[in-house]
Amino acid sequence: MSKISLKCQSCGADLSYNIGDEKLTCKQCGSSFSITDIIKENKKEKVEEKKEVLESKSTNGQLLKTKTEFDISASALGCVMFVALTILFSVILTVTGIRVKMGSFAYFVLHATVEGIFALAAVIVAKSKKTSLIKAAAMDKKVNGNIVALSFAIALVSLLGFGNLTNVFIEFLCYFGFSTEGGNIVINNFWQYLGMVFSSCAVAGFAEELLFRGVIESGFKKWGMKVAVGFSALIFMIMHGSALQTVHQLIIGILIGYVFYKTNNLWLGVLIHFFNNFIPITEVYILSLVSKSSAEVAAETVGLGTIFIDLIIALVIAYAGYYFINILIKKLIAENEKVNGKNKEAETTSSIKVDGENQEVEMTIDGAPAETSDELLETKKAEKPTISGGTIAMFSIAGLYLVIEWLIGTISRFMWG
């Protein structure tokens, strides 16, 4: 008959008893107890240990916990906070009468500050939800040189493969009288180039990903990949408030959202976002040095050929781009798994020693013991995502404001240029 090795709860001496025996007596100190009591005591100690880890402060006897993931209400709050902060910042600029010259140092500082609103909204959400932003937004992951190179390649192929679709969409808008004035990148010197890289690539890449993927998409993860990626990409597109960028922002939002969902590593999205902005900015700057001004280069990006022919060409190139991006994303996911491990919830087990071999005797769900497979299934069923009326209201308010703002900006370009 197999024997289980344990320790005496009174003196700590090594014990052994035959499986099936209920009573156990320590030969060293004479203490007597049952194996059932031992199991119950061990579970009680584990619960107390978990409480000590979770307990950071105690106010009026209430246990304060730090969560490690966002829910859908956090996504809604993130949208509302972004809208509220944007309105507040606009009011401040209007009241103070601050005006800056395009391309000046103050302009790029202001641009970086505006981009910082995304990050500030994410921080406020984390604080209000008592959630660790670093863990919930998956900022505790690592990257290496291969990941950086693959992120650059994905951004480049995305721009080459899907950029023509954006141009066709702009041609379509222009056909109906849409004005592209003020919507192109203008860089006249090296310092303006550095300013654009800092504000539009570094700050924007981090701040926007922190909110859109780290908070909004993370809050939708329990709803499945299609909902999480699709909704975050849609909000990402609308929040930019530019009809010119509609197609591009939607495509890049889906692309980055998919990578984040599969890897649970925010830094991959930040890198792809950075290079997605860095490549066209660098292209415009180099071309302006070689032969033409950036304004002339930008002017040539629309109105070439008929819309129909351009669309056919764009779709063919987009299909090729989709094929190569799939290959690159698979390599990126594999490299991320090599550096950080697979993207799955940690499974913890407790074990006792049986004839010198470790045997799993307890299953846990998110750190809590599940006694049977039936309990595990019931717990999973209970995790079916739901949405409250308050969350729906927050999404509705933020969404309505953003859509109206987007429509006003778009219509004004049709009517007044």
Language model features with spans:
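Function-critical hydrophobic alpha-helical transmembrane segments in multi-pass membrane proteins
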Residues: 160, 182-246
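Interfacial transmembrane-helix boundary/kink motif in multi-pass membrane proteins
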Residues: 56-83, 132-163, 345-347, 368-400
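Juxtamembrane helix-loop-helix connectors linking adjacent transmembrane helices
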Residues: 102-108, 134-204, 403, 407-417
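Cys/His-rich metal-coordination motifs, chiefly Zn-binding "fingers/knuckles"
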Residues: 1-48
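Hydrophobic core of alpha-helical transmembrane segments in multi-pass integral membrane proteins
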Residues: 83-90, 116-124, 155-160, 310-330, ...
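Alpha-helical transmembrane segments in multi-pass membrane proteins
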Residues: 81-127
